[in-house]
């Protein structure tokens, strides 16, 4: 993942108490961001909510809103709610303006979102590294709605601005992610190498390198970096997710299941994470585990994807009638931009199953 927290740029001599308070707050932000990177979304939200309870600043509301965008399936409604609260406190808050533009990007309103992000850059006069970074990051967050070339421009500007205080590893992670989106693995790996020079937890770097090697079908190097990530920090959940994906490629069913068990163990029990785990179990044909995991959080998540997953599971059980009902509910609730071609494929096989049952009954 790709995150950044700001530290005070100017500290007035003699304001020791203010400095200590700001430092403690920054440390807390850092802790929250580390949890986001580790796929511990519930813990991160808990931290950001605690920050708001102590100090309801525009920045703190931004981080909470951002956590809802960072989870596997973004919750745009709750993200917007927090960005709006941040802007109510400070109408000029660049971060919360970026947050709202990011929501538009996620919903497919690309031209409008980029125009708003560009306006924020203009208003800030491109003086703040964090603002530049967040704009660049926003342009990489959504698979089908992004602008990696523009992201690279903004992130490089952020890196240049941050040199004086030290460039955070998160900047380089995101730069690498942007290069990956442009299908430039060489520069992506270079960015990850630069991240490894400053990262406190190198497991995060090895994980990203592993997924990059996997995408390039360099499986030996992918495996080496997965092992490095786990050996560096055995509690770093994303490494086990990468390991599960690696084992799945080689059709190692039992090993994939064990990797998913470990991922579940070290990620937290945030409902959005559990929904992701249910999907991973389904992909691995662990249908019983997928159903059990989905059932535990079905009423706790608002993401319409839950209806589609349940439809898949019911289709697998030849329960075509309920599968049809859940798929129809999914269509009724989901953003149109999230509907993918395979959804029509599921619909077709469900109707084929219903037709077959009717024929048998006749």
Predicted regions located by residue number:
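Bacterial N-terminal signal peptides that target proteins for export
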Residues: 2-15
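Alpha-solenoid helical repeat scaffolds
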Residues: 15, 19-362
């Amino acid at each position: 993942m790709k995150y950044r927290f700001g530290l005070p740029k100017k500290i007035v001599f003699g304001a020791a108490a203010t400095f200590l308070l700001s430092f403690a707050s920054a440390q807390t932000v850092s802790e929250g961001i580390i949890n986001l990177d580790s796929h511990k979304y519930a813990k991160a939200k808990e931290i950001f909510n605690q920050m708001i309870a102590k100090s309801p600043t525009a920045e703190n509301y931004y981080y909470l809103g951002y956590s809802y965008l960072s989870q596997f399936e973004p919750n745009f409604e709750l993200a917007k709610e927090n960005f709006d609260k941040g802007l109510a406190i400070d109408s000029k808050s660049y971060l919360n303006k970026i947050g709202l533009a990011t929501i538009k990007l996620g919903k497919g309103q690309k031209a409008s979102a980029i125009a708003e992000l560009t306006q924020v850059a203009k208003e800030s006069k491109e003086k703040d590294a964090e603002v530049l970074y967040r704009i660049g990051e926003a342009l990489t967050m959504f698979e089908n709605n992004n602008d990696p070339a523009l992201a690279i421009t903004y992130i490089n500007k952020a890196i240049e601005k941050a040199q004086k205080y030290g460039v955070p590893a998160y900047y380089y992670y995101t730069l690498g992610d942007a290069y990956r989106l442009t299908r430039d693995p060489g520069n992506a790996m270079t960015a990850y190498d630069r991240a490894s020079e400053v990262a406190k937890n190198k497991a995060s770097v090895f994980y990203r390198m592993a997924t990059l090697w996997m995408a390039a079908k360099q499986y030996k190097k992918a495996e080496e970096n997965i092992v490095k990530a786990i050996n560096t920090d055995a509690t770093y959940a994303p490494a086990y997710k990468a390991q599960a994906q690696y084992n799945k490629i080689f059709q190692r069913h039992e090993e994939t299941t064990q990797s998913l068990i470990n991922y579940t163990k070290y990620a937290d029990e945030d409902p959005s994470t559990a929904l992701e785990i249910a999907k991973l179990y389904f992909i691995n044909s662990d249908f019983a585990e997928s159903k059990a995991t989905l059932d535990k959080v079905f009423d706790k998540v608002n993401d319409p994807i839950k209806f589609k997953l349940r439809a898949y599971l019911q289709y697998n059980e030849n329960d075509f009638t309920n599968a049809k009902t859940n798929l129809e509910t999914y269509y009724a609730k989901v953003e149109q931009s999230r509907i993918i071609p395979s959804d029509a494929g599921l619909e077709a096989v469900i109707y084929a199953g219903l037709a077959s049952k009717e024929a048998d009954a006749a």
